[in-house]
């Protein structure tokens, strides 16, 4: 087998390799407990533990339960997230964009035609490098009307500059929601956690979650502000290598966001977007390792299926 083929095979481990890797990583440094929940419920639970600033949303099947569960837990005093119900998904995405530009941590959830209604907003959010997290419970795009699960909606996001993490069970929905925000703030890009509508969004499984919200918040880390004289550009890396973020509400550091661009600025913007995507390839394995040391659950880029005897994948 050539070096290229070998590296390709290693990049796409088999299901058996993935399972053995996960089982081998038994060291768990954080207390956890069992929950019997669906993907939607665990997406909401992860958001509750993160304690986002804002969720701009508009309900649509099969992702409606995410906002519903967050609203219920908020009524119980379990988080401080401000849920803002918009008049439609386009407006919900605008709420998220404005809140992120204002320095907030932002969360959203949608599906199918709701995603398409908001589609215009997504390249703007990535192109102006606003970190946020959106869950997509994947569903058939209507035409004719259908609410069954497929990937016809998420495919529209492929060229919008968003990172997409696909979760194939409720446990991964929980884990990826925690990893997604940290990744978003590492590379200054918005991240989608996508999962199958009804199959993953509604079916319940036994899952492990961190016992304390503080564990999650320590893993995510604080969102660093740019109230620092050494920081002179949007999302400039500081001496520690951590991203710091401007806020349009920070009057001490005024900044214009989304201003008009011609060549060569627009070309440079797209190249910077490409570099951020490439940086994701480096950051994501590091975050997987960090998360595994905390949870005992190891994730990889891809899972192979019947790849054991393949020469090329």
Q: Where in the sequence are the language-model features?
A:
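Conformationally flexible catalytic loops at phosphate/diphosphate-handling active centers
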Residues: 191-304
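Thiamine diphosphate
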Residues: 2-3, 23-156, 161, 178, ...
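Flexible, glycine/proline-enriched loop segments at strand-loop-helix junctions
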Residues: 160-172, 189, 274
């Amino acid at each position: 087998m050539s070096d290229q083929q070998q590296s390709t095979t290693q990049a796409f481990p088999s299901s058996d390799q993935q399972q053995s890797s996960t089982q081998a990583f038994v060291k768990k440094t954080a207390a956890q407990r069992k929950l019997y929940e669906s993907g939607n419920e665990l997406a909401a639970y992860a958001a509750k533990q993160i304690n986002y600033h804002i969720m701009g949303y508009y309900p649509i099947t099969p992702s409606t339960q995410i906002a519903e569960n967050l609203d219920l837990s908020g009524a119980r005093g379990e988080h401080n997230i401000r849920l803002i119900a918009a008049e439609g998904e386009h407006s919900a995405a605008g709420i998220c964009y404005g809140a992120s530009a204002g320095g907030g941590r932002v969360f959203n959830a949608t599906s199918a035609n709701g995603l398409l209604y908001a589609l215009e907003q997504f390249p703007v959010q990535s192109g102006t490098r606003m970190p946020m997290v959106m869950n997509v419970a994947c569903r058939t795009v209507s035409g004719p009307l259908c609410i069954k699960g497929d990937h016809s909606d998420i495919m529209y996001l492929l060229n919008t500059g968003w990172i997409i993490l696909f979760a194939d069970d409720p446990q991964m929905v929980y884990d990826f929601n925690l990893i997604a925000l940290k990744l978003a703030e590492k590379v200054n890009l918005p991240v989608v956690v996508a999962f199958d509508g009804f199959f993953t969004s509604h079916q319940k499984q036994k899952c492990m979650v961190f016992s304390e919200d503080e564990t999650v918040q320590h893993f995510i880390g604080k969102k660093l502000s740019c109230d620092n004289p050494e920081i002179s550009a949007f999302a400039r890396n500081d001496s520690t290598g951590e991203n710091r973020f401007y806020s349009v509400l920070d009057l001490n550091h005024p900044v214009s966001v989304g201003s008009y661009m011609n060549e060569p600025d627009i070309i440079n913007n797209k190249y910077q977007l490409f570099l951020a995507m490439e940086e994701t390839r480096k950051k994501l394995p590091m975050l997987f390792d960090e998360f595994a040391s905390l949870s005992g659950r190891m994730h990889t880029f891809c899972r192979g299926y019947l790849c054991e005897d393949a020469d090329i994948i």
